[in-house]
UniProtKB/Swiss-Prot annotation:
It comes from the Bacteria. GO terms for cellular component: cytosol; glycine cleavage complex. It catalyses: N(6)-[(R)-lipoyl]-L-lysyl-[glycine-cleavage complex H protein] + glycine + H(+) = N(6)-[(R)-S(8)-aminomethyldihydrolipoyl]-L-lysyl-[glycine-cleavage complex H protein] + CO2. The gene is gcvPB. This is Probable glycine dehydrogenase (decarboxylating) subunit 2. One of its GO terms (molecular function) is pyridoxal phosphate binding. Gene3D superfamilies: 6.20.440.10, Aspartate Aminotransferase, domain 1, Type I PLP-dependent aspartate aminotransferase-like (Major domain). It comes from Syntrophomonas wolfei subsp. wolfei (strain DSM 2245B / Goettingen).
């Protein structure tokens, strides 16, 4: 394991030296309130430029992303990020803007935001969108804030519950809890779909809404979605669409046509913008017309003289993000939508579904697939067979995949499947790449039967071997010891 950068520090080893300065020195304490002055110099590492470059290049070579290889992380839609989108976001007219510029000087940017909103409305079947939320979970929060504001505006103050399926993303109950809602779990039926009878039993005048992903986290389409919407609406609740799995229906079906009232998109999933450290993300929120007044302000509007920011929205929940959202991400997503168009988005969806079913079909002999039927963009396999017969867990299988050069799938989720392996291949993967993954998974299944210990100790070829995850969670070391308390 390489040293942390502090351990490489050498006194006097800095890489830059300032030329002599002919400006008279001042006493800092005479100009700055001593309360804001450091008593000691910060403990920063001292290294030459080449050592800093080598340190971070070495670390970067350990990273794994979609540009390195296959990344089948279920429910994360790790698709290729077209590099032309980066070019678009770096155009000087976008990259050099400042959010405090007057509206008349940023008409191009406002037009892009206006057009991006219209595209989102068309794709989602919604009437208005806000582009402010900075991530998927942030979009969830914004959407539930809108639902809460709607009920409060109607003086329907008894609606303090949010329904969440037992297969839902963990952010759904977490978001509802943050906003003070009581979370009520709705059971799945034997098909892996929302149990309509249980939903009906959960509905009441205290329910503000139901959060739903469609396709769900099993990769299955909620075929009774229209009846689900009817049940929720009949009792005065609203239907929220978590857009995490939009890639399974984009260009083919629209949440707004299914009865959803509020939704969020993940631009960093469905629309080809980077995830995580390559991001940031973006989670635009769309609503039907009767909820549009509650959207965060400002919204971009158009008049004869041009585009402008509309703050005159008395029912608005207010801003949920500084300025106007992660603008560069929106530029990239807009470029992606415009490049593919409607037919291209539909084809991308169809290829994602094809790839998912191709993997499911070829892995069904070696791995248990609890809901083994036509799926959408992802499916859930299970390591139950390997655990029962050979003592090899899903975690062992996932770690071993790293030795074969693949990022592991999502593991142990959804919670309703024991030893779950949630696999999402996305549309940008070739058949040849999928065949390589199938071969690796089959070889791991053989190893589980013939040499299970090799899986128990995996990974073997990575720089960092198997991490003690329990110890890392319970005894984290978050600071370099030289900086003080751990």
């Amino acid at each position: 394991m390489s040293k942390v950068i502090f351990a490489r520090s050498v006194a006097g080893g800095g890489g830059f030296f300032l030329p002599p300065c002919d400006v008279a020195e001042i006493e800092p304490a005479a100009e700055i309130n001593p309360e804001f002055l450091r008593a000691e110099a910060p403990l920063l590492p001292e290294l030459s430029e080449v050592e800093v470059v080598r340190h971070y290049v070495e670390l970067s070579q350990r990273a794994y992303g979609v540009d390195n290889g296959f990344y089948p992380l279920g429910s994360c839609t790790m698709k290729y990020n077209p590099k032309i989108n980066e070019w678009a976001a770096r155009l000087p007219g976008f990259a050099n803007l400042h959010p405090y510029q007057p509206e008349e000087s940023v008409q191009g940017a406002l037009e892009l935001l206006y057009r991006a909103e219209k595209l989102c409305c068309e794709i989602g079947g919604m009437d208005r969108f806000t582009l402010q939320p900075a991530a998927g979970a942030h979009g969830e929060l914004t959407g539930l804030m809108i639902i809460k504001a709607y009920h409060q505006h109607r003086q329907d103050l008894a609606r303090t519950k949010i329904l969440v399926p037992d297969s839902a993303h963990g952010t759904n109950p977490a978001t509802a809890h943050v906003l003070g809602f009581e979370v009520v779990e709705v059971k799945s039926n034997e098909e892996g779909l929302v149990d309509l009878q249980d939903l009906k039993a959960c509905m009441s005048s205290e329910v503000a809404g139901l959060m739903l992903t469609n396709p769900n986290t099993l990769g299955l389409f909620e075929k009774e979605i229209e009846e689900i919407a009817t049940v929720v609406h009949a009792d005065g609740g609203l239907l929220y669409y978590d857009g995490a799995n939009l890639n399974g229906i984009v260009g083919v079906a629209r949440p707004g046509d299914m009865g959803f009232d509020v939704l969020h998109f993940n631009l960093h999933k469905t629309f080809g913008t980077p995830h995580g450290g390559g991001g940031p993300g973006s989670g635009p929120v769309g609503v039907k017309d009767f909820l549009s007044g509650f959207l965060p302000h400002p919204l971009v509007e158009k008049k004869e003289e041009g585009y402008y920011l509309d703050y005159d929205r008395p029912l608005s929940i207010g801003k949920v993000r500084s300025f106007y959202g992660n603008f560069g991400v929106i530029v990239k997503a807009y470029a992606y939508m415009m490049a593919l168009g409607g037919p291209g988005l539909r084809e991308a969806c169809e290829l994602a579904v094809l790839n998912s079913n191709y993997l499911r079909h070829h892995l069904q002999e070696d791995y248990h697939i609890p809901f083994n039927r036509l799926c959408k963009h992802e499916f859930v396999a299970s390591g139950q067979k390997q655990l029962a017969e050979n003592g090899v867990s899903t975690l062992d299988i996932a770690k071993r995949l790293m030795d074969y050069g693949f990022h592991p799938p999502t593991v142990y989720f959804p919670l309703i499947v024991k030893e779950a392996l949630m696999i999402e291949p996305v549309e940008t993967e070739s058949r040849e790449r999928l065949d390589e993954f199938i071969a690796a998974m089959r070889e791991i299944a053989r190893e589980a039967r013939e040499n299970p210990d090799i899986l128990h100790q995996a990974p073997h070829s990575t720089v960092i071997k198997r991490v003690d995850e329990v110890r890392a969670a319970r005894q984290p070391i978050l600071r370099w010891p030289g900086l003080g308390a751990e």
